[in-house]
Amino acid sequence: MRLLHVVVATVSLTGAITSLIAAQHYNVSSDVIGGIEKEDFGVGCNSRTKYPTAADTSKLQPRFAYLITNSLADFIAVHFIKFNLPDNDFVQIRAADPSAVDNRVLRYRGNESNGVFFADALSTKSVIVELFTNASSSAQKTNSSKCVGFAVDSYQYLGEGSTLNGSKEEVCGADNSREASCYSGYTNAFRASNAVVRLLIKKSTGSFFCTGWLIGSEGHLITNNHCISTQSHASNTEFEFMAQGSSCSINCEGARACFGSIRASYATLIYADATLDYALVKLPINLSGQYGYLRLRSSGAVMNERVYVPQHPAGWGKRIAMKSDNGFGTVTSLTMGGCAPNQVAYYLDTQGGSSGSPVLSWSDNAVVALHHCGGCPNTAINSYKLVNDMKWRGILPANACT
């Protein structure tokens, strides 16, 4: 469990740092799996560095600092295997480069964070992990059943698009999807895309990109079960809104490109269903008033109706797939097999990371299917199945369907 304080500024420190240890991994080592690099550092908790016990009168200088550098990194997300600090102490993580685009400063405080968790990912190739203490540790409250301090065992630095059982979500012919802002003139569709969110899910096997979207008016979000299937997944997911270019000319083709606003770093899992491949979570803050929300069509998709898919393929900035090689995208089947029986099919372009995207009807901007599987055509779970299942379980959010 942890609460995160974010300061949007870089930190400038003067004077000597008590302890600065550099771990510079310029190349991937042989034991790296899925964008994970092993580490072994910390303060207290049986690490090589003892936890400070003398009072610290300075609020500017860290008592400990550790540098992580990886030239292959798209981001760096530190994994804490132990975290139990005195109430007023905190660990701070920031980009080592003061000119880094992602200039957030992440702070995890002793009275708000504990246990095992991933820090938020910073989009940079080098970070500094620092410990700040504000008073004698002996005078502050801690969990007496645990060691005092923190320990890091690894960090994640690359993400891949999540797919269902290795199925390939595909571009069908030429990639006809476009940057979301290219469709700003299509007012209703562009407004609907505001509810679509880029997800970075940090799992024990690595980091994965997916797409999710706000459903109903109570602060819920839906994505695929193969993206989020456990509370641990939900607790280690970053929910990034408005990750898109401000104009059509801006190229957002890159993992975590066109940085948006990470409004939540965890969620509560309401239910995940493997058969229908959906996961319903609730964010710690209701953002439906700010970004709007989408609604499922209770009657489901209609054969040959025009559809479009706002999405974050490969963790890129938001794109909208509205056209195929043969014109505007339409529902081409309601009975497609493959990843599931009786799927909705369409020839709109997707990639790994598009999983969980809404398939919306052009006529009423209702969600008619939940994209989840690749191939040409690409396929999705019909919306009426989701509505019926959530109603039966008593978990359908308010204003979640038409």
Swiss-Prot record:
It is found in: Secreted; Host cell. GO terms for cellular component: extracellular region; host cell. Residues 1-23 form the signal peptide. The keyword Glycoprotein applies. The keyword tRNA processing does not apply. Keywords: Glycoprotein, Secreted, Signal, Virulence. Its main location: secreted. InterPro entries: Peptidase_S1_PA, Peptidase_S1_PA_chymotrypsin. A motif (RxLR) lies at residues 104-107. Glycans are attached at N27, N111, N134, N143, N165, N286. Has the canonical translocation RxLR motif, but lacks the canonical EER motif, which characterizes most oomycete effectors identified so far. Belongs to the RxLR effector family. Secreted effector that completely suppresses the host cell death induced by cell death-inducing proteins. This is Secreted RxLR effector protein 73. The lineage of its organism: Eukaryota, Sar, Stramenopiles, Oomycota, Peronosporales. The gene is RXLR73.
